[in-house]
Regions:
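Internal catalytic-core helix/loop-beta-alpha segment
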Residues: 93-124
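An active-site-proximal "capping" alpha-helix that borders the catalytic cofactor pocket
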Residues: 29-30, 84-100
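His-Asp-centered metal-binding catalytic motifs of divalent-metal-dependent phosphohydrolases/nucleases
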Residues: 45-77, 90, 110-120
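Divalent metal-dependent phosphate-bond-processing catalytic cores, especially two-metal-ion Mg2+/Mn2+ enzymes
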Residues: 15-43, 54, 64-65, 103, ...
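Active-site flanking loop/helix segments enriched in acidic
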Residues: 4-28, 32, 67-81
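Conserved acidic
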Residues: 21, 45, 82, 86
Length: 196
C-alpha cells in the first residue's frame, strides 16, 4: 500500500506532533503499524494507520512539565488526569484533522473510538484497536524509543529496557510480541546493556 495517501493528514497534524517528541514517536510507531498490518491483512489499514498517526496529538494541549510529572513520573501515571485529558483532546483534534483532510464520518468515528481510551482503557475493542496499541508499544523497544523514553521516566537505558521487557505480556497480538522481543534483543546488543 502506498502510505503517501496519508501525507495530507501528516501535514495537517504537524503542529500537534511537535509536543512530547511525538514527531519521533509517531513516525516510528506508524512504521511498526505498517508491519503489523502486513501480518494482519484482515485489519482495516486506513483505520489503523490514521489511529496510530493521530492517537497522541492530544498531548499538544498539555503543558510539558505536566506531561513529564503527571504523565510519566507519577505513581499511577497510566490513570493520571493528564492521560485522560490527552485522549479526549486527541479525539477533538483528530476529528478536526480528519475532517480537514476529507475523511468520512464513519472513518472519523472508527479512528476516534480507538484514540479515546488507548492508554487508559483496560482492553481493546477489536483487532484494529489491538494493532494500534501494539504499534504504540513497539517503538519503545527500538534504540530511539529507549533514548527518548528513558528521559521521560528519568531512568537509565538499562532500567527502561528492563521495564519494557516486563511489559511484553501486555502485547495484544502474537506478532507484536515477537517483533518486540527481536527488537529488544537488538537494542540490548547495540546499547551494550550487558555491560551498561
Amino acid at each position: 500500500m502506498d502510505v503517501t495517501r496519508y501525507d495530507p493528514v501528516w501535514r495537517e497534524a504537524e503542529t500537534y506532533l511537535r509536543a512530547r517528541k511525538n514527531d519521533i514517536h509517531i513516525p516510528l510507531s506508524f512504521a511498526w503499524c505498517q508491519k503489523l498490518l502486513d501480518l494482519h491483512p484482515q485489519a482495516d489499514r486506513d483505520i489503523c494507520s490514521l489511529a496510530i498517526l493521530l492517537h497522541d496529538i492530544g498531548w499538544h494541549s498539555v503543558d510539558q512539565a505536566k506531561i513529564i510529572g503527571e504523565g510519566f513520573r507519577s505513581k499511577n501515571f497510566l490513570q493520571s488526569d493528564v492521560r485522560y485529558f490527552h485522549e479526549k483532546e486527541g479525539v477533538r483534534l483528530g476529528t478536526q484533522v480528519l475532517r480537514a483532510t476529507g475523511w468520512s464520518d464513519s472513518v472519523i468515528d472508527a479512528v476516534c473510538e480507538i484514540i479515546d481510551g488507548h492508554d487508559t482503557r483496560s482492553a481493546p475493542h477489536h483487532l484494529n484497536d489491538r494493532i494500534m496499541r501494539d504499534s504504540d508499544k513497539l517503538w519503545r523497544y527500538e534504540v530511539t524509543g529507549i533514548a527518548v523514553a528513558c528521559d521521560w521516566f528519568g531512568v537509565t537505558p538499562h532500567a527502561y529496557v528492563d521495564q519494557v521487557e516486563a511489559q511484553l505480556p501486555k502485547f495484544e497480538t502474537e506478532h507484536g510480541r515477537r517483533l518486540a522481543e527481536a527488537e529488544m534483543a537488538d537494542t540490548r546488543r547495540k546499547l551494550m546493556l550487558h555491560v551498561l
